[in-house]
Amino acid sequence: MQNIRNFSIIAHIDHGKSTLADRMLEFTNTVEKRKMKDQVLDQMELERERGITIKMQPVRMRYAHSNGPGPEEEYTLNLIDTPGHIDFSYEVSRALKAVEGAILLVDATQGVQAQTLTTLAMARELGLKIIPALNKIDSPLARVDEIKAEVVETLGCLPEDVLEVSGKTGSGVEELLEEVIKKIPAPKRELENEKDFRGLIFDFQYSDHKGIIVFVRVFDGEVKKNDKLVFSQAKEKFICLEAGIFSPEAVPKATLSAGEIGYIVTGIKKPGIASVGDTVLFANSNTQTLGGYMKPSPVVWASVYPESQDDFADLARALDKLQLTDSSFSYEEEASGLLGRGFRIGFLGTLHMEIFVERLHREFSVEVIVTTPSIMYDIKSKNGKTQRIYSPSLFPDFGDIESIQEPWVDIEVITPNDYMSPIMQLLFEHEAEQGDSDVFGDGRIKMHAQLPLRELMRGFFDKLKSVSAGYASVSYKIGEMRHADVARLDILVAEEIVPAFTKVVSKKRLEEEAQSSVEKLYKVLPRQMFVAKIQAQALGRIISSKTLSALKKDVTGHLYGGDITRKMKLREKQKKGKKKMKERGKVNIPQDIFLKMMKS
């Protein structure tokens, strides 16, 4: 155990964490040069396409290190690569509980970001040893001295404690690994009896052949093939079919011992048995369980329906399987008069939702209709009853509502001084209450504010990047519930409400949102064989309306000559047919239209 080091890398999105991990794998010969590719640890196709880490990924490296004049010693370095985006911070928190230290990686061209501070606070709370490092020092835009001063101020460390590396060229990687060995403590057993086994589940995945495969950090004892084990929470007993490590692919091992990070194949194929934060013990053991994780609460909700109701069972199976690889979303069945049976699903953010929908399509070939994302509201009706509403389409009629409460968020924005004015304007436009501001390093400022969660989800992140030329960053945490002056906005197509387009908006922006939604739908909705109105309705009245003209079909094209009477009869017949279609017709809305409106 003395020669094991377990660590993670804390970094904001796009600060080069995965690239640095690539260089570590290369330097330690964990991956052969001929097999090297960018983002080796990003296993999902989506991660590679988007250039972001979505799922954490553990890997074991071997590294020979000299402690002095004597012979070199071999060390086992277990790295857990983690996501940098705020929507996947739960993945990061789980990784941090399985390690003893973390590298705080800061982009030398960008500086310390707000989300990095949030993750750093989590690491410090867990008592992890922090090793600061500046990345991208080879960039001509690097401001090494300036950013190093920021890191020193943030951590309270010395300038010489901050290492300088380049994930691109590999410069400084050897020194960084040496620092990991010197400064991050070796793992320690917690139980007196060395034969008692305890493993913390920090992630799991599902295999059609092997069943549930749990990713574990072994805190005490050891486990091997054919050992009888139990999930302490579910009380489900099973036989260890295989134990092993990640290198970075799964490699079976005779035993998995205290201090190590690896996997256990359970053979269990039932959903809902394994859970992140559970402890794996020997069957019939009375050993105390390890402290688990606090499950995150969803931030946004959306209803998801199969494009065809014949595919409902396929969607249900897909959700069961997805939850075996992503335990951070929650779902329950619901029904809509227009869209049929579906599920209301809670996500950690809008990016989490986008990735989820994309995975449904790619991994399970399920085409879905997704409603406009929403947050939760507490609504008190005039009859005195209070209910928590997650779907805008379930909002009561405006005349029945006594009051509405919504969650607010506390946000922290870090920005160069030059962009403070447009950011203050952006905060004003999103109904924020501005708080204190503090100087943060040389030429930057840290701003505090509070605003409604619905306003944060209304494109705030993208707008912040836009007004600050990409230099500002933001982190947030859910705060208190407050009074909400909002209304339900329905979109009607051919005089029928389409629940998927219903949203809750501020009364101040009701007309603006109504016109914007109608205009966008008008532009993307294919024309029908009959005239169809697109309308926005709120507070009992139509606020905006536009008419989609009918698709013209030449019913006289097959006629020759100048029989005008025959042509007139055919056109009159077509007119009557379109009138009937309009009276009874439902507009066919393709699935991609729902996705386009969801992003509006």
What do the PLM-derived regions correspond to, one by one?
Residues 1-600:
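Structural and coupling elements of P-loop NTPases
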